[in-house]
Amino acid sequence: MREPDFLNHFLKKGYFKKHAKAVLALSGGLDSMFLFKVLSTYQKELEIELILAHVNHKQRIESDWEEKELRKLAAEAELPIYISNFSGEFSEARARNFRYDFFQEVMKKTGATALVTAHHADDQVETIFMRLIRGTRLRYLSGIKEKQVVGEIEIIRPFLHFQKKDFPSIFHFEDTSNQENHYFRNRIRNSYLPELEKENPRFRDAILGIGNEILDYDLAIAELSNNINVEDLQQLFSYSESTQRVLLQTYLNRFPDLNLTKAQFAEVQQILKFKSQYRHPIKNGYELIKEYQQFQICKISPQADEKEDELVLHYQNQVAYQGYLFSFGLPLEGELIQQIPVSRETSIHIRHRKTGDVLIKNGHRKKLRRLFIDLKIPMEKRNSALIIEQFGEIVSILGIATNNLSKKTKNDIMNTVLYIEKIDR
């Protein structure tokens, strides 16, 4: 295919119709380098201002040289380029999160509203097959979205209908680690798919067909259920349990960055069935609110806010509260800093005790009232004790007791730290 053919496809799809500035995720591989060539050549026709963003993962000897070459390329094209270096222990998941956090920073800094990536049909096949092996929910087997709105930005993948063989051989960097089978995606690409294609030469097309069919079903269900108010539990529970699950999953599609696991989805179902009133964070900055026969899922405000008896602290925020400085994911320096492992996926609640509070320690549930009696905690200290809560469970009673955090809590691994420092009131 020729470059004008790709331009015509982009124009027909109207990828950039709503955008004046776009950030291109430039890895240096063939797919992203060719996308760079098309977008930079046809900026005028597409009516966009192009901005480049590259992450140097520091995993190969060549990576620093490649970074220099990309800087030269950007200078020759008279385009701005932003570069960040990955540090710390490497994993596919950590690298992916690092990249997208960086891309969002660049977009915020430049005022861009579109993030463009060079994912293509071969990536789509690998992604769907990986998710199938991992046992993911059916809706995710539709694969990578061609266009995806996340908050105030749109991720655009204009090559998703093309295979890598459709791209001309142009100057690019070859990542030799792609030939190694250390990572799951590489094993899919290098071993599993070639073996399965021996059984069915059109196996890749079959996988893409399944993904498209699931997407059709998903869109059809959303259209057919448009007049059903899922948030009205009386209406939701009037259907069979199978239909309830499908309607609830369709409702959750409104929140693309929520991404509940099967276990978390089942937990939400149980809350809706058996809790009369409920309000707690669930995941990724969302909270579930239930009041008798009504419920809703909504984003928590990004700022920490202090209520009458409770404070809500969000990831990468700090707040001083009742003689302590609480820092969620931002390290504090000092000799007397208390550290509590927590999850960054949802907010932390800091409050005083309530009737019926329970602490889970070493797998056993114990009422706070009994714990305070056993530890002979004075009444004044019981009333002033600060409770740290996440996922609806007590993580710690500050200065008194801490939950057993060596296990997964609410299906989410403890992946950051709450730092606490005693300060003067």
UniProtKB/Swiss-Prot annotation:
The family this protein is said to belong to: Belongs to the tRNA(Ile)-lysidine synthase family.
Disulfide bridge map: none
An annotated GO cellular component: cytoplasm
Keyword flag Transport: no
EC number: 6.3.4.19
Domain notes: The N-terminal region contains the highly conserved SGGXDS motif, predicted to be a P-loop motif involved in ATP binding.
Residues noted as binding ATP in the record, renumbered to the chain: S27, G28, G29, L30, D31, S32
Keyword Transit peptide: no
UniProt record, GO biological process: tRNA modification
Gene this chain is encoded by: tilS
GO molecular function: ATP binding; tRNA(Ile)-lysidine synthase activity
Superkingdom, natural source: Bacteria
Pfam families in UniProt: ATP_bind_3, TilS_C
Protein name: tRNA(Ile)-lysidine synthase
Annotated function: Ligates lysine onto the cytidine present at position 34 of the AUA codon-specific tRNA(Ile) that contains the anticodon CAU, in an ATP-dependent manner. Cytidine is converted to lysidine, thus changing the amino acid specificity of the tRNA from methionine to isoleucine.
